[in-house]
């Protein structure tokens, strides 16, 4: 029987920026929240779990964050630490979609496989911007947090806007692996497939 590939990403595109004067940040008991009172943050064509957003226009939270939970159409939690900061109702805050991480997939270390051989295939559209990158990340943690992930050498794909398919082999007894797309300003990742 032929081995089947695990789909890490299936057709994920760059999203337009979200700007609002009602966006605030809250840090409470280790839960870090970005929320709005009327600006829609999630839903069709908006933010989802795994999206990377760069925040600008704030006093204390101009940084990149990973969406970890969608609470409602007006609220998300993020993996990274935010500083509590209320909106003032007049200052525009922008959430710029700059990439995404895939769900985690079991690596060879999960199954205690001795060879650790993995193959990944990336497929993007020709409109995928030239400085965007896709790379694989691994972890040895059984229940990883955002800080447990590290880049796997030799797996980075950078588009030249003409190459739309690329693959990489990598070796390691990673318990979990995932893909990470960064610096995305245009285009679509059609698919990322993994064989372990």
Where are these regions (language model features)?
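Beta-strand signatures of extracellular beta-sandwich domains
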Residues: 52-54, 133-137
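Conserved Ser/Thr-centered positions that define the repeating blades of beta-propeller domains
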Residues: 137-143
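Short, intrinsically disordered N-terminal pre-domain segments
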Residues: 1-21, 189-196
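A short beta-strand element within beta-rich, extracytoplasmic domains
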Residues: 114-128, 180
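Short Trp-Ser/Thr-centered turn/loop motifs at beta-strand boundaries
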Residues: 5, 10-13, 97-114, 139, ...
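Extended, low-complexity, turn-rich repeat/linker tracts enriched in Gly/Pro/Ser/Thr and Asp/Glu
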Residues: 61, 124-133, 183-188
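Small/polar beta-strand repeat architecture
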Residues: 15-49, 54-100, 184-185
């Amino acid at each position: 029987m032929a081995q089947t590939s695990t789909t890490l990403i299936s057709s994920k595109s760059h999203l337009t920026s979200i700007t609002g004067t009602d966006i605030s940040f809250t840090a409470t008991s280790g839960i870090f929240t970005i929320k709005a009172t009327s600006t829609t943050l999630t839903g069709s064509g908006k933010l989802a779990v795994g999206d990377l957003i760069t925040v600008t226009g704030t006093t204390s939270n101009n940084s990149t964050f990973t969406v970890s939970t969608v609470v409602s159409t007006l609220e998300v939690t993020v993996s990274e630490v935010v500083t509590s900061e209320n909106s003032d109702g007049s200052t525009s805050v922008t959430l710029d979609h700059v990439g995404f991480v895939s769900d985690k997939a079991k690596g060879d270390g999960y199954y205690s496989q001795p060879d650790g051989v993995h193959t990944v295939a990336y497929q993007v559209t020709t409109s995928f911007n030239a400085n965007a990158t896709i790379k694989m990340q691994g972890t040895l943690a059984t229940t990883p947090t955002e800080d447990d992930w590290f880049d796997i050498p030799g797996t980075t794909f950078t588009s030249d806007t003409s190459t739309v398919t690329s693959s990489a082999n990598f070796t390691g007894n990673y318990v979990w692996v995932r893909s990470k797309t960064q610096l995305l300003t245009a285009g679509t990742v059609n698919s990322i497939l993994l064989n372990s």
